[in-house]
Swiss-Prot record:
Domain Globin, chain residue ranges per copy: 2-143
Full protein name: Hemoglobin subunit alpha-2
Organism of this sequence: Anarhichas minor
Heme keyword on record: yes
Further remark: Hb2 displays a low, effector-enhanced Bohr effect and no Root effect. Hb3 displays pronounced Bohr and Root effects, accompanied by strong organophosphate regulation.
Record text on subunit structure and interactions: Hb2 is a heterotetramer of two alpha-2 chains and two beta-1 chains; Hb3 is a heterotetramer of two alpha-2 chains and two beta-2 chains.
Length: 143
């Protein structure tokens, strides 16, 4: 699913509104994912505390949103812009790429709950398309 110029503008505008809360969004989304999709805990078994408000969850949530920020900055070519992250997730971390969609959905839920007035149906569609593209870019090295 490709992003139109209108979609790109909507994503950049939404990121401008939410970026100051990115760490909180990432921590909340990752915490939700670990609770709602407990099978994802297998990737974090080396953490001593997998509870939603734990320090490792908050730290990794921040890292996730740093990746989202990178994707926003590389919105015109996320596949090329996220190649290093794709390689890391495919070859080092060995994350099932289906989990990218799961976490993307959790991020959208958190954005919608934190920014209900800004998360219009149009913004939702553009952000969903963006996260689909981001997930696809991260899965590039799995082929």
């Amino acid at each position: 699913m490709s992003l139109t110029e209108k979609d790109k503008a909507a994503v950049i505008a939404m990121w401008g509104k939410i970026h100051k809360s990115a760490d909180a969004i990432g921590a909340d989304a990752l915490g939700r994912m670990l609770v709602v999709y407990p099978q994802t805990k297998t990737y974090f078994s080396h953490w001593s505390d997998l509870s939603p408000n734990s320090a490792p969850v908050k730290t990794h949530g921040k890292n996730v949103m740093s990746g989202v920020a990178l994707a926003v900055s590389k919105i015109d070519d996320m596949t090329k812009g996220l190649m290093a992250l794709s390689e890391q997730h495919a070859f080092q971390l060995r994350v099932d790429p289906a989990n990218f969609k799961i976490l993307s959905h959790c991020i959208l839920v958190v954005i919608a709950s934190m920014f209900p007035k800004d998360f219009t149906p149009e913004a939702h569609v553009s952000m969903d398309k963006f996260f689909c593209g981001l997930s696809l870019a991260l899965a590039e090295k799995y082929r």
